[in-house]
């Protein structure tokens, strides 16, 4: 038998064996590729050039790819729009690629429409549902097909347009909440040219901005941000001066040398006040133009009158006018805050007039109108489809909602990140109207509010997995075109929308098949560019074609003799007694209209002015807050005549008294766990109103009231590192 | 007598334990999802190591061949062999083969295969016996002395940060 000593010996030996017998290396796995991606070198990175589609600015990107996985997105140094720079939203494109909530298989409705309940299905079945619907429609009533997309450029717009035209439906609508309608209308009125100008900020000596947050949002924030840096620091003897007018201290306004707060919607009046002083003091190069403007009514825009309308000191208007005229070349630009009023065109025309008066059109450091379509002349009438004007399409969307209710459409094809069910004013009831369309097919990567209302969702790849081309709306002098190529193999079982349309056209036959005679979208692009003499291999290596020789800019016929913009006052909905505060909404730097809200990198990006993350807030002037008994961090219900939403108060000294500012972008009900249930949606407060001059959505057109409320959770603001920031100290 | 028997029992159980533990560890290292035979490929068919370990000339890692590369030949060669059938199954399912790692250097060393291979060092210098075995084994222990002996003999860098970067 074992005695105690033996038991201990045996026990010790067992422990030794167990410890050291098992102390060998645990085998690690080496998992090779099944099929290696082309040109893969283990542990070595490859860089692929493409273009960003996180916003419509169209920056060039290069993506670091290691062993078939995209690791980092950077700006393309060769691309004229961003010259190697890239913003946070572009960087976050990787998260869209790897997002766990991406749609990976076609989805078929498995509950009632709008319930958001879907079941996965095969591509064969999904495409047969699509084709059965299209074939039925083609035979009976082709004009009852609706295609509602985000604004598209390049050949994917060409494919969509040709498909709809050959199918026989005129109902092709592109919706963009931040369309440039007012800018186009203003330039048509002042310069006689309906186009987005090129602002040569880098070479300007003086910059006036009227609610134009060009450094954070707007047409091309990366391009203008870089140019702004050059304006301030790249010339040894000149540091350009920057003056910002607006109702809110945005990040752009905070960068200005002088920030002059003005009443919402009075940007046009402020610009004309400056113009008045320039003409009165004979500070303009063209006396004839000045005289005709003076006679047309500019004489009435005295600094005193303008001061009353805007809240500016007449002496500030005089001083800015003298500086602007004395520091040529200068630029006056106006942005979304001014364009989104019911007098948006008037506001933007005021800024345009200042450029014309100061003789800044067509000169270095001023504004110009490049001929961006010069390279595509061989497309004839189709050339305009490659770079359509960046309009909002608001009038068409409103019209389409009416038609949905009347039953005009029997089928709708939806695509894009502008998410109309989220980004249209709530009183329009877009979602409700969409439910009355018998068949709705969405092309989407994520189940946002709009895609959730469809009965078939076809998954599309993200921009990092796509073939394509693009022409940036601003930031280059001419025919610079970008090439998109897949930087990785598609992660999910997705197909590009143009590929689906081309395949559908082939099945439909006849005129539709003849209009899209390609095997796929890649072939369409390659044939088209080969026909233009573009070296595709070089273009894909460089990320596009960037000609060194600038095509001659277009001439602005009325630049020498501009006409005076027709004065218009901004209108605001809501009884001032019940709704005492003006509502100023602005696109969030991280989420824009809300499309970035599903990416956690963007959710945790602190807002540059308030440092808030993950939630919604409302900026309130300290005096207003005191009157209402509100403190920083309090929960409030923001109510307009059209709806209400919850938000946290951020007491901010640079918000004009009587104005509250709300960022757009949060307030999703769907769109994944990162986006949903993070406060209210400011679009739900907005009226269905448009800028009278251009038809653009007028977001700055309602008053609101604030009422204290107890909200769950709190607003998280990151630590401020710039030192003391308490408003008590600077008031 | 009783005492000696007890001692023998003790020694036997100790040995059994050690053997069991050791065998378990050894089998985990030498067993692979597919019994790939290095000897047949390298000696009988005279294939260059770099045909399969194709990134040895280009990158730090020599690389493990993709399933696709196996199937280039084994679509037609030895298709009835039970081990080849396993590869065909991986290929059919489009799944990678989960090989067990045999040779590994610690994280604090940098060993660029391409430097050695392009300098003309034969693979067998560091991987001796690989041409004689079927499933890969590591016969040579990669101690710093082993590396330095060769570096000194060839008059190449023995700076610390040549390898410890």
For every predicted segment, state its role:
Chain A
Residues 1-281, 289, 313, 319, ...:
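N-terminal export/assembly segments and adjacent metallocofactor-ligating motifs
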Residues 62, 141, 145, 199-206, ...:
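Domain-level signature for respiratory redox metalloenzymes
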